[in-house]
UniProtKB/Swiss-Prot annotation:
Binding site for GTP: Q11, E72, S141, G145, T146, T180, N207, N229
Coarse class of the protein's main subcellular location: cytoplasm
CDD domains linked: alpha_tubulin
Assembly with partners or alone: Dimer of alpha and beta chains. A typical microtubule is a hollow water-filled tube with an outer diameter of 25 nm and an inner diameter of 15 nM. Alpha-beta heterodimers associate head-to-tail to form protofilaments running lengthwise along the microtubule wall with the beta-tubulin subunit facing the microtubule plus end conferring a structural polarity. Microtubules usually have 13 protofilaments but different protofilament numbers can be found in some organisms and specialized cells.
Site feature location: Involved in polymerization: Y448
Cofactor: Mg(2+)
GO cellular component: cytoplasm; kinetochore microtubule; microtubule; spindle; tubulin complex
Protein name (Swiss-Prot/TrEMBL): Tubulin alpha chain
Keyword Metal-binding: yes
Family classification: Belongs to the tubulin family.
Record organism: Candida albicans (Yeast)
Active-site residues from the entry: E255
Length: 448
């Protein structure tokens, strides 16, 4: 058995977690009360598949291997009273009494530490129920107080307690134009610095990029958070589909980092997903393998605002689902490689890993997204993502040059030196990206 424990931290983490578990339940044929749908004697996905994410009780109920953590009770109360309230184990929903007030230091040093032992105790019990724990899947935002502060604290502790296990993050990155709090740049830089050596692979998701996808592809004039979360859930589901269903090329958690992370610090793959279209457009789309593969290389299908045409690809994973044949995939990849727009770094010429899972994608009931017979999720480690770091670093510098809002952090027991240390670490990260993008054999040097 290769189990995975999902940990959702903070408001964004918990709400994305809700959308994901609703989708997983539908994909495996599990009802909101945890029992199987009529006519099924086993969950869809084979004996091995569903047990990576669900544990089975003696009465035949399926319980998610998931933990919800927040410093204020509102979001977790929604889970406790929502449609899926009977699905989760009540002790796996952990809420504090007061929130982190968008302050990394409150989540990391003061309020967050008070509930840390409860969380770790619960994680320990969940890992004891696993035969062969594969790793952790972390969902949180980088801009909030709980997601950044408590999220990074928890990752640090898990590194100490479960050093060899994989730790994958889905991190909501602050959107360039759509901001929910003034101090997002501080929280993002501080949490990235703290988690850089603890997370093995971080898939970033940026609200603005997803807003644009909802507006452009799903015809939603004013997308709300549930529309965004349903789209993010599709991506998370595609990334984890190979762990939950049978396919010709199965990928496990360790394989992601082996294939995508050339150096430990450069572990921020760019995520693209196709096809994304509304029900009204569904009948007009051909949706062939080569079409959806090409779409993944267009900036409009990416989960982070940056231009991949300006960067170079170090490694790429294409995870297909549904009615897909290997020959079609090979042709589609050959087509992409022949185009000049896709540049690979010269020290990694092969660059493409393919995963195929035969379970077709499912759309969440009531969501605007139409279900398709096949879909692809592309994870690519490209130097273009450095653009996202440059943006947030610039905002950090503007505020920190005036020491704006710093007293709130220092008042919670943080030292001012941590700000400069974190900023220097991110400057080093930007330099790392520039370095890996430069050619290892410049053409002009022909001396022997």
């Amino acid at each position: 058995m290769r189990e995975v424990i999902s940990i959702n931290v903070g408001q964004a983490g918990c709400q994305i977690g809700n959308a994901c578990w609703e989708l997983y339940s539908q994909e495996h044929g599990i009802r909101p009360d945890g029992y199987l749908q009529e006519g099924l004697d086993r969950p869809k996905g084979g004996e091995e598949g569903f047990s990576t994410f669900f544990s089975e009780t003696g009465s035949g109920k399926y319980v998610p291997r998931a933990l919800y953590v927040d410093l204020e009770p509102n979001v977790i109360d929604e889970v406790r009273t929502g449609v899926y309230k009977d699905l989760f184990h009540p002790e796996q929903l952990i809420a504090g009494k007061e929130d982190a007030a968008n302050n990394y230091a409150r989540g990391h040093y003061t309020v967050g530490r008070e509930i840390l032992d409860d969380i770790l105790d619960r994680v320990r019990r969940m890992s004891d129920q696993c035969d062969g724990l594969q790793g952790f899947l972390f969902t949180h935002s980088l801009g909030g107080g709980t997601g950044s502060g408590l999220g990074s604290l928890l990752l640090e502790q898990l590194s100490l307690d479960y050093g060899k296990k994989s730790k994958l993050e889905f991190a909501v990155y602050p959107a360039p134009q759509v901001s929910t709090s003034v101090v997002e740049p501080y929280n993002t830089v501080l949490t990235t610095h703290t988690t850089l050596e603890h997370a093995d692979c971080t898939f970033m998701v940026d609200n603005e990029a997803i807003y644009d996808m909802c507006r452009r592809n799903l015809d939603i004039a004013r997308p709300n958070f549930s529309s965004l979360n349903n789209l993010i859930a599709q991506v998370v589901s595609s990334v984890t589909a190979s762990l939950r269903f049978d396919g010709s090329l199965n990928v496990d958690l360790n394989e992601f980092q082996t294939n995508l992370v050339p150096y430990p610090r450069i572990h921020f793959p760019l995520v693209s997903y196709a096809p994304v279209f509304s029900k009204s457009r569904a009948t007009h789309e051909a949706n062939s393998v080569s079409e959806i593969t090409q779409s993944c290389f267009e900036p409009g299908n990416q989960m982070v605002k940056c231009d991949p045409r300006t960067g170079k690809y170090m490694a790429t994973c294409l995870l297909y689902r549904g009615d897909v044949v290997t020959r079609d995939v090979q042709n589609a990849v050959a087509q992409v490689k022949s185009k000049k727009t896709v540049q690979l770094v010269d020290w990694c010429p092969t660059g493409f890993k393919i995963g195929i899972c035969y379970q077709p994608p499912t759309a969440i009931k009531g969501s605007e997204l139409a279900s398709a017979s096949r879909a692809v999720c592309m994870l690519s480690n490209t130097t273009a993502i450095a653009e996202a770091w440059r943006r947030i670093d610039r905002k950090f510098d503007l505020m920190y040059s005036k020491r704006a809002f710093v007293h709130w952090y220092v008042g919670e027991g943080m030292e001012e030196g941590e700000f400069t240390e974190a900023r220097e670490d991110l400057a080093a990260l930007e330099r790392d990206y520039i370095e890996v993008g430069t050619d290892s054999f410049p053409e002009e040097e022909e001396e022997y």
